[in-house]
Amino acid sequence: MISGKILRDAIISGANNINNQRSRVDELNVFPVPDGDTGTNMGMTVGASVAELNALDDSCTVGESAKTAASAMLRGARGNSGVITSLLFRGFSKALEGKKEADVADIVAALQKGVEGAYKAVMKPTEGTILTVARVASEEAAACGAEEIPALWDVVLTAGQKALEDTPNPVSYTHLTLPTKA
């Protein structure tokens, strides 16, 4: 199970990691527009949630942590990658709304809801982007059968890394089925 405190601390840690790796992420930004600002925009977006998350009490629920992060990211979103990141978190938070803690099934559902919401919100979703990385990680999470959160995160990280390595080659995504807009 993940508590609100654990989720809060994980998001803060992730924000710090993105900001520490900002230049490296900027260099990865080659498709569809090689403008070299993905790390900067994601760092600013996720970083916008840190102060509000730090203000949460250690007894916060997982739903409160997710909602706080998503709301702050939406307000602080910068650039396409930042907006998409905030949309992923918005869907993630909706799936955790009202939950005190989250188990593997809750996290898988939250990842799926985040991807679904982001694809629906983007007018022309392009494969080989942050959307693809999130979708592939979510699909692998749903299929892996993990029983514990650490095992689930290992699958998510491995799948995300593999999808990221494939992003410069959009042809590798031609066989994939895109989520449909409702």
Q: Where are each of the predicted segments found?
A:
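N-terminal amphipathic/basic leader segments beginning at the initiator methionine
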Residues: 1-29
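Flexible, glycine/charged-enriched surface loops at secondary-structure junctions
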Residues: 24-33, 58-62, 121-130, 146-153, ...
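Single conserved hydrophobic/aromatic residue that forms the stacking wall/gate
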Residues: 175-182
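Glycine/serine-rich anion-binding loops at beta->alpha junctions
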Residues: 33-40, 73-84, 176
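Transmembrane helical cores of multi-pass ion-transport proteins
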Residues: 4, 21, 51-73, 101, ...
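Hydrophobic or amphipathic alpha-helical targeting/insertion segments
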Residues: 89-93, 97
